[in-house]
Amino acid sequence: MSFNVKFWLKLSLVNLLIVAMLGVLMRYKIGFDFPYFSQKNIQHAHSHFAFAGWITQALYVLMIHFIIKKNQFLDTKNYNRILVANLICSYGMLFSFSYQGYSALSIVLSTITIVIACFFAFFYFKDLDKIDASNPSKSWFKAALLFNIISSVGTFYLAYIMASRNFNEHWYLASVYFYLHFQYNGFFIFTCLGLFFSECNAIFPLFKYD
C-alpha cells in the first residue's frame, strides 16, 4: 500500500483550518451571544482536536515520510491505518467534546488516541532500527515518541478526575501541565529537531553527519 504524503498533509491543513475556526468562535462568544455551544465544551474540543487532529497527525505524516525516504520498500499499510484511526478519533472528539464536554464517549476516544500513539511508537521504533545508526534523527525521534507516551499519564489522570467528579483544582492543573509539558517540550520539539536534522545536509551543504 502506497503512502500519499501530499494527501495527508493537505488533510492536516484542513484540520488546522477547523482549529482556527473554533478559536474564532470562542473569541466571538466572549463579546457576543452564541447560545448553541458551551464555551467550556468548545475549549475542550479545540484543544483536543488541535493536538490530535492537527499537530500530532501532521508530525506522524512527516515522520513516516522520513522513514520512507530511508527505506523505499517499506510497507506503509500499518501507518495508513494508524493515520485513519487517529483521524476518526480526532473528529469524534471534535463533535463529542463540542456537544457533551467530558463524557464517556469523549474519554473513550481520547484513550484510543493514546493506544494509537503506542502502536505508532511500536512500529516506528522497529523501522528506525533498520536505518543507519549514524543518522542523528533516530535518537530525536525515539525520545519524541517516548515523551509522547509519558504525557499520556496526565491525560489518564485528567480523564479519571472528570469521570469520577472528584475535582481537585491542584491535581487538575498538575495533570494538564504534566501532559502539556511532555507534549510541547518533549514530543513536539524533539520531533521537529529530528525533522530538522534529517534535512540538514540539504539546508546546510557543509553540515555532514555521515
Each language-model region and where it sits:
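Hydrophobic alpha-helical transmembrane segments of multi-pass integral membrane proteins
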Residues: M1-D210
